């Protein structure tokens, strides 16, 4: 539900003519990118279905809706439905097949317990995801106010007397707000930047590092992060693959390198690596030339202006690729004095650490969820057997 589109009231009314989704319903994708994926209808939201979706309304007297959603998303049922696909270009399930999908028979108490157990993992994953969204929004707000809109300088020009006000209310600590406000000039220069700032090339801020490697014991022991595992518009790596899957066109990255999705750059895939690993040449590995510039460099590369520049100057028509040499590296970016960049990094660092910790926990929780789900659904293990594993994941 995180990437739902929006429709007009007229379209909404047309699409709910037969049935309006309500809390407890299951929304099931029978075709396309999300083939075979089920989602629960959330509380207090108005939702209508697209043409590739099916509304399933569980009988509450017979089945727990969350349990049914878990079953529909289980590897067991996934293997089952792939034998009934009737599409050649796009995967598709017809309605008779959906109506005939098998559902395991569990006592209602067992259904509720499984739903509560695995649902708690899902809820924690979602809480971490939302927390990271909030932290990233805060980081972007500070970056854009300071380095795109030049808010502190403009507020000084407008006569703002209070450091908290000068910093746009984005620095809560009074002492830190005063120290930061003192670093921003009270006038704009002829170059359109705060007095004393200058434009510099992106290539003078970061280096595009290409450390090629081949499948080996080293790559097998490190996480593998191909471009499709990098989440769009997320500053941290949320998903990795086993190093054994790293087979060709490989490049290594280090902790605190910045991964930039070069293939189809408009997808806006930028993430900070908090571990050593391997990716492919469809990703730029950008390393700050000065370690203390990490936060400023990360947010500069993540800014929409950089993504737009990379997209407009990409090569290829069917599959565009960003070009670093003599192109993206030459993009001009505002460059404040080093002390401003360092102070910004100090503010950003705890946010990034929190985001990385949440992402790491989510990977552990997801792995635990994926391990338990088929075993619980098949009866291979019982609920009492999983308590120790869940405690370790928490």
Model-derived regions, located:
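Short, Lys/Arg- and Gly-enriched loop/turn segments at beta-strand edges
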Residues: 34-41, 267-273
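Non-catalytic DNA-recognition/assembly elements of restriction-modification systems
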Residues: 100-104, 108-150, 174-214, 338-345, ...
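Non-catalytic accessory segments of hydrolases
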Residues: 32-33, 223, 265
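Extended, domain-scale alpha-helical bundle/helix-rich regions
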Residues: 127, 149, 153, 158-167
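Short aromatic/hydrophobic "clamp" motif used to bind/position activated sugar donors
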Residues: 51-53, 256, 281-283
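A generic structural signal for residues embedded in beta-strands
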Residues: 28-29, 259-261
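Basic, amphipathic alpha-helical recognition segments used for DNA target recognition
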Residues: 1-3, 17, 23, 42-46, ...
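Sequence-specific dsDNA recognition surfaces
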Residues: 1-26, 183-188, 203-255, 279-280
């Amino acid at each position: 539900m995180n990437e739902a589109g929006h429709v007009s009231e007229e379209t909404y009314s047309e699409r709910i003519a037969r049935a309006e989704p309500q809390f407890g319903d299951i929304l099931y994708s029978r075709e396309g990118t999300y083939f075979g994926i089920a989602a629960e209808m959330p509380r207090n939201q108005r939702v209508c279905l697209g043409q590739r979706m099916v509304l399933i309304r569980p009988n509450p007297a017979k089945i727990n809706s969350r349990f049914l959603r878990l079953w529909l998303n289980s590897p067991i049922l996934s293997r089952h439905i792939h034998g009934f696909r009737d599409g050649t270009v796009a995967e598709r399930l017809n309605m008779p097949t959906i109506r005939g999908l098998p559902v395991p028979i569990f006592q209602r108490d067992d259904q509720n317990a499984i739903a509560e157990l695995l649902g708690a993992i899902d809820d924690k994953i979602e809480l971490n995801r939302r927390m990271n969204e909030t932290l990233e929004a805060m980081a972007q707000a500070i970056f854009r106010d300071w380095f795109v809109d030049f808010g502190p300088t403009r507020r000084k020009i407008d006569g703002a007397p209070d450091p908290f006000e000068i910093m746009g209310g984005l620095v809560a600590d009074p002492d830190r707000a005063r120290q930061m406000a003192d670093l921003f000039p009270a006038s704009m220069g002829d170059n359109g930047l705060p007095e004393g700032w200058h434009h510099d090339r992106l290539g003078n801020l970061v280096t595009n590092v290409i450390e090629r490697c081949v499948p080996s014991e080293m790559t097998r022991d490190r996480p593998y992060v191909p471009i499709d595992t990098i989440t769009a518009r997320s500053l941290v790596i949320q998903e990795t693959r086993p190093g054994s899957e790293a087979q060709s066109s490989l490049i290594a990255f280090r902790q605190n390198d910045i991964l930039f999705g070069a293939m189809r750059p408009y997808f806006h895939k930028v993430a900070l690596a908090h571990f050593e690993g391997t990716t492919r040449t469809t990703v730029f590995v950008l390393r700050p030339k000065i370690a203390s510039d990490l936060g400023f460099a990360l947010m500069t590369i993540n800014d929409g202006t950089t993504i737009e520049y990379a997209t407009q100057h990409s090569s290829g028509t069917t599959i565009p690729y960003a070009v670093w040499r003599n192109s993206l590296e030459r993009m001009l970016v505002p460059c404040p004095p080093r002390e401003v960049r360092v102070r910004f990094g100090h503010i950003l660092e705890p946010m990034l650490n929190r985001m990385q910790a949440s992402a790491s926990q989510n990977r552990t929780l997801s792995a635990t969820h994926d391990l338990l789900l088929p075993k619980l659904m098949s009866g291979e293990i019982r609920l009492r057997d999983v308590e120790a594993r869940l405690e370790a994941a928490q």
